[in-house]
UniProtKB/Swiss-Prot annotation:
It comes from Salinibacter ruber (strain DSM 13855 / M31). HAMAP family: Ribosomal_bS18. The lineage of its organism: Bacteria, Pseudomonadati, Rhodothermota, Rhodothermia, Rhodothermales. GO terms for biological process: translation. This is Small ribosomal subunit protein bS18. Belongs to the bacterial ribosomal protein bS18 family.
Length: 70
């Protein structure tokens, strides 16, 4: 789960799909994308994060499922 003190999400302009360490904060131990009510980010940023995670998965930068589920 993401800590709201790490990044100012209101002024975040671009979520980079290549920054997998940042994106892993928004994925649970099963590999699912955490909902906005859990992460506490604004709706616009949640949409960007979701899109970036899906792009990273498609390009094989991130797994679709975690190692523990396989």
């Amino acid at each position: 789960m993401a800590d709201q003190n790490d990044v100012d999400y209101e002024h975040l302009e671009y979520v980079d799909y290549k920054d997998t360490e940042f994106l892993e904060q928004f994925i649970n131990n099963q590999g699912k994308i955490l909902p906005r009510r859990v992460t506490g980010v604004p709706a616009r940023v949640q949409r960007q994060i979701t899109k970036a995670i899906k792009r990273a998965r498609h390009l094989a930068l991130m797994p679709y499922v975690s190692e523990s589920v396989r």
